Each structure stands twice: as C-alpha cells, then as structure tokens.
Amino acid sequence: MFNFNDKIVFDDKKYDVLTVGEMLVDMISTDYGDDFECDTYKKYFGGSPANIAINSKMLGINSIIVSSVGNDGLGKFLLKKLQEHHIEIKYVRQVDYSTSMVLVTKSKSSPTPIFYRDADYHIEYSDELKYLIENTKIVHFSSWPISRNPSRSTVEILIDECKKYDVLVCYDPNYHSMIWERGHDGREYIKSLIAKVDIIKPSEDDAERIFGKDTPENQLKKFLDLGAKLVILTLGKDGAIVSNGEETIRFNTLADEVVDTTGAGDAFWSGFYSGLIKGYTLKKSLELGFAVSAYKLRYVGAIVDLPDIDTIKSMYDLKKLR
C-alpha cells in the first residue's frame, strides 16, 4: 500500500521517467470560447506523455519518450522541440502517416478538443523499448496509446514487463470516446487496466466520461473498487482528493491565476514525478505536483518555461518539502 508519509525507493537506473504515447500538435485558439468560431489558431507542442517528458527534464530529472510522429513538417517541428530540451529522439519513430493534431479552444476550464489522429498510435514493441523498461524507474502512459492498435498491444506488453523489473507504472485515463476506434468506446477496457497499474490520476471530467456523473467521493470509490492502489482525482478549482484505499486526503488548489488549462494535468505529473525521484514523501510529492500545475496555468499551451524546483517551492510556500 502507498503510505502518504513514506518515500518510494527506486533502484539505481539510467532513466528516471519513461513516457510512452502520443506526440501531437495542439492548435489552440487565440481567443477564449468553446464554439470554434475563432479565426486564428497558434501551433503548440503537445501530447500528454511528450509534455511530461519535457516538463520533467526542465525540473531536473532524466526523462525519455517512446512515440511516433509523421514523416512531415509537423513531425519535424515536434522532434526539434524535444531536441531543444535535450531529450533523445532516437526512440521516436517517423512513420508514413500524418502527424496527429488536436484543435482546441483556449479555455479557463476544461478545453473542448477536436481530434485528428494518424501517426501517434503506430508505436510497436521492440528490443529498444524492452531495454528502456529495464533501465527506468517510472513508466507513464495515457489513454491515447491504448485506444488503438498497434500501440494498445505495445502497452499491454509494457505493463507486464514493468512488473518483472520493479518499475512504477502510472496511468492517466484521459478518456475521450472520439479517440477510440469505431465500435469500441474504451470504457470497459480502461476499467480492466485499473488494477494493473500502480498510480492513476483521473480528472473529474475523465471520471464522469468513464463512470457517469456522480460526486467526487463516489467516483474515487469506483476506481478503488476496481483495484486501484493510489487514486489522484483532480477537481479543477476545487483542488483534488487522493486515496490509497485506507486514507483519503484533500488538497486545495494552489492556482492564483488561470490563463489556459491545456497541459495542467501533465504539469502535475511532472512535478509529482520530480518529487518522487528526488526522495520526497508521497504527500510532499503530490504538493509539488499541484504547485507545478498551478504555475503552468498562468500561461497558454501545455509546455511553458518552468523555473527550477526551489523557485516553485518558494512561490507556493513549499519550503519544507523534503
């Protein structure tokens, strides 16, 4: 069981965090609104696992990503961004499909997306991926790679391999029915994965899409009843509730300014992982995650220039973190 006042002890391995999944272009409107009537959109680096890899690198931990992009201009744009942040690109395949893209309105709440998918789910299991699993402390994936094959089969193998090598497996169930193949809405499949991972972080919207509308406390219980070991249920402006099945803790939001919510969850994961890797307790790592997320909310786009951890701790009065 995950105890909030304990640290997670990792073996000494080359990589701190391995993210597996989508790299894509976020086209974000320059004006607020959920009706897509804006005439102007700006191109941003995107994809939850990719965002986490970059954010984590900026926070001082060694991250790596396995993904696939198109052999096109947008794919080159994404690869260049990884290189700018000193992340190895040799595990990102360029495939003969168009780079995936999401059209999204700039939003102060949950943004409304339109998905254009092609290259992102062409991730295949390989000896290289097996090597990375053996040599990393934490593996992260989202619902995008499990929504279609071949990447779904790849993640299934990945989960089994992680168990062999004592790798912490974390899952972001960012469920959208539109990203799943026709005739497969994915909810039952997601439910079948919950007991197989170590940590899961649904948003309130994710929980509603998976289980239907309910109170946060009941949603939390549904994840736990399906075998979740640690559930981090984020509630937007209402903070978050986190439970290991025995103890439940509520965290208030640290956000003092909200410009754009795109990538806020990814920023949380990045801060949380950084805390775990640096030897903070589980509770203190959660607090750091919420602080990094609050900082990101001040800016448009999923990737922002994050300051170092000491600066974040000072900004959000987390000086006692350790």
Swiss-Prot record:
EC numbers for this chain: 2.7.1.11
GO molecular function, one term: fructokinase activity
Positions of ATP binding: 201, 234, 239
SUPFAM superfamilies registered for this protein in UniProt: Ribokinase-like
UniProt xrefs under Pfam families: PfkB
GO biological process: fructose metabolic process
Swiss-Prot/TrEMBL keywords: ATP-binding, Carbohydrate metabolism, Kinase, Nucleotide-binding, Transferase
Entry protein name: ATP-dependent 6-phosphofructokinase
